[in-house]
Design a protein with these regions (language model features):
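Class I SAM-dependent transferase core
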Residues: 1-84, 92-95, 100, 113-127, ...
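Conserved nucleotide-cofactor-binding alpha/beta core module
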Residues: 72, 76-195
Length: 218
């Protein structure tokens, strides 16, 4: 399989028509090799518009390329920023975040997936991502505040404890709701308040242990 041609087709046939137009986002999708983070059994589907299974680990699946790209575009990260990811999975989103940011701390609840992600990141030469095992829905307050937080899985509502770990001007991307009605949202911290913007509708797998939690109240 010609992965470079498949990567080009993904960008030109899926992402640009879907209004992913930020040149920095499109560039990093060519630099970070998605196929290297996909389990070998599913590598031929690396650029398909689908959620790819990550083996037998609790049924976890990767976001589709379209959701990944829109999330990066919404966060609009800068090179100096400190980023937190909740739900490492294969490590691919962490690698994308790391290509845009100064440092990424990614928390994965499944030790098997955390090991997979560390191996994938090391093989890809990513050195500014740290993967920890734990329940990321509480965030990582010891290393807060963060310029950006990426929640790589659906939650019923974003826990306030995650929002509180944002810097002023910090952004948090998440997918809220329950199938079949989910909404990708971007929160921005403005002093002690939080602005919520609806980005798009989608359906993705929920984070493990993502039980209903206290959420941001307008």
């Amino acid at each position: 399989m010609n992965f470079e041609q498949a990567r080009f087709n993904m960008v030109e046939q899926q992402l640009r028509p879907g209004k992913v137009l930020n040149p920095d986002v499109l560039e990093v999708l060519f630099v970070v090799k998605r196929e290297e983070f996909v389990p070998p059994a599913h590598r031929r589907l690396a650029f398909a518009d689908t959620q790819i299974p990550l083996g037998e680990a609790d049924g976890a699946r990767m976001f589709s390329p379209r959701v990944e790209a829109h999330a990066l575009q919404a966060l609009a990260m800068k090179k100096h920023e400190n980023v937190l990811e909740i739900g490492t999975g294969s490590g691919y989103m962490a690698a994308l975040l790391g290509a845009h940011a100064d440092h990424v701390r990614s928390i994965e609840i499944d030790p098997q997936l955390a090991d997979m992600a560390r191996a994938n990141l090391a093989r890809a030469g990513v050195t500014n991502v740290v993967v920890e095992v734990g329940n990321g829905l509480a965030g990582s307050p010891a290393y807060a505040p963060y310029d950006a937080v990426m929640v790589s899985g659906a939650v019923p509502a974003v826990p306030q404890v995650l929002l509180d770990q944002l810097k002023p001007g910090g952004r948090l991307f998440a997918i809220e709701g329950a199938a079949p009605v989910m909404e990708a949202v971007l929160y921005t911290r403005v002093d002690q308040d939080f602005r919520r913007l609806s980005v798009f509708e989608t359906v993705v797998d929920s984070l493990r242990d993502a039980a209903p939690a206290p959420a941001f109240v307008f």
